Amino acid sequence: MLFAYIRGNNDAAVKMNMTAPVLVNIHPRTEHLQNSTYVVHFYVPQKFQRNPPLSAEAQPVELPQHKYAAVRRFGGFMDDSNISVQLSALKKSLKGTGRDKSSASIQHSGRFLLYSAAGYNSPFEHENRVNEVMLWFD
């Protein structure tokens, strides 16, 4: 749906270049039988940011305005398993910093908040890939 939007399936029939990063906000499951929720964000090019073309299928949204993030960079293709491994490593690196219990991915007031994964490369690039996992702080 989002790829079709940037390829011209929008009210203005405007094709846009793909931008980076592709950001995936991940809302962890709160109960054992639930699935995590993934929300994928494509950034629109700067010339469309004030007035992005509308679409019945893809809805422009503003991202949450978190103040800070702890970030861990990693290579390769991004998937559920390496996101999980990298997120665990990022959480481990925060132990004892005062941020280890305040990140948005830690349970807060009975609910889990989001963390994000970002991919910076085209799916056709196979070498020197750059990805990040992010824990958000307010």
Sequence positions of predicted segments:
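A solvent-exposed interaction/effector surface
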Residues: 1-138
